[in-house]
């Protein structure tokens, strides 16, 4: 009788441990995952980086300015989060390579990429957009996310897969007046996302596109949206 009770208690204990472990896995799926977030020292990018770190991921933030990186890292580390950072202009190959190399050196690999960097150097009619503005907008908003993804895929494959999140805008579906080249670039990101999703699925890498509305970007103080709206 006592032996039966003991065996029953052991079985109950094993079941409880399995259930607790399962709950922990579901609750903290990002524990010890490694995430890169571009343009992540303020606004939406900073909020994404903070949330990933709060969910126990190791996060590498980036910005074009060292002082912004230092401030963001100090703030998030002050909250007890696992965050490091480096300067990265996503339009420069050497900066993209450094960002990837830092994550691999510090944490052994990469599981998550959030491509958040974007610019809007022009406000007005599409007919007034110069070639220089087109080049800058498409280089940062479209080409850079594609090349960042290309840079991290080999590292994700080494870890059995990963996740890429491309931050786009509701402008991909409903163009906002005045944000002419920006609207086009964000629509292009939808095509990039869909193509990458098909190509990378066999490698167990998910690709998703996040479409934010401009009011959310403005409320987060992102990229001068509020200032440009006032000028308009």
Swiss-Prot record:
User: Which miscellaneous remark does the UniProt record hold?
Assistant: Three homologous proteins DHRS4, DHRS4L1, and DHRS4L2 are derived from gene duplication of DHRS4, and the gene cluster is arranged in tandem in chromosome 14.
Q: Which Gene3D superfamilies match?
A: NAD(P)-binding Rossmann-like Domain
Protein role: Probable oxidoreductase.
- E.C. number, please? 1.1.-.-
Whichever gene encodes this chain, its name is DHRS4L2
InterPro entries listed in its UniProt record: NAD(P)-bd_dom_sf, Sc_DH/Rdtase_CS, SDR_fam
Predominant location: secreted
Q: Which residues form the active site?
A: 182 (proton acceptor)
Cross-referenced Pfam families: adh_short
Spell out the family assignment given in the record's similarity comment.
Answer: Belongs to the short-chain dehydrogenases/reductases (SDR) family.
Q: What class of enzyme is it?
A: oxidoreductase
What protein does this entry describe?
Dehydrogenase/reductase SDR family member 4-like 2
Q: Where does it reside?
A: Secreted
Q: Which organism is it from?
A: Homo sapiens
Q: Glycans attached where? A: 183
Gene Ontology biological process: retinal metabolic process
Q: Which residues form the signal peptide?
A: 1-19
Could you tell me the keywords of this UniProt record? Glycoprotein, NAD, NADP, Oxidoreductase, Secreted, Signal
